[in-house]
Amino acid sequence: MKHTLKNWFAALLLAVPMSAAVASGGGHYEKVEIDLRDQVSLQRGAQIFTNYCLSCHSASGMRFNRLKDIGLTDEEIKKNLMFTTDNVGDVMLAAMNPKDAAKWFGAAPPDLTLIARSKGADYLYAYMRGFYKDPTRPNGWNNVVFDKVGMPHPLWEQQGVQAVE
């Protein structure tokens, strides 16, 4: 689980500044290089995850205290990364009610606990980079990796608005 957490945060962090470019070939994605020893990068990824993903998506198989694996203290976790609980031993639950999310986005957002493990870091990297502006979609966004995705682009302010030609 420790490497999965690090892969997830690193892939998320690396996806932010990149443009939407995915290798063609049905499931063959650009290779992401992750340095699991770069704790500062992993900590930034954890902050991005809790600020942008945990609003809608739970990670119910992960407890906040596991963030100590990437060098954070209980105090840092409580002060900067916890918004729905005060106990660092609690699981990471979304702030948004799943029923409300289903009504607003067409489906309840999936739990993200095992996404990096089941899909792989390359998929996650491509997915986060794959959002593009699509005026035909209800929320104005689509994704080259997950067509007709119900999720709006959570990191567009960091990544910029991408277009598919």
PLM-predicted stretches and their roles:
Residues A23-Q47, S58-D69, E76-I77:
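Electrostatic cytochrome c docking/interface patches
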Residues S41, F49-S60, A108, G120:
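Short pre-active-site segment immediately N-terminal to redox-active cysteine/selenocysteine motifs
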Residues L72-V144, V149-E165:
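Electron-transfer interface patches adjacent to heme c in soluble/periplasmic c-type cytochromes
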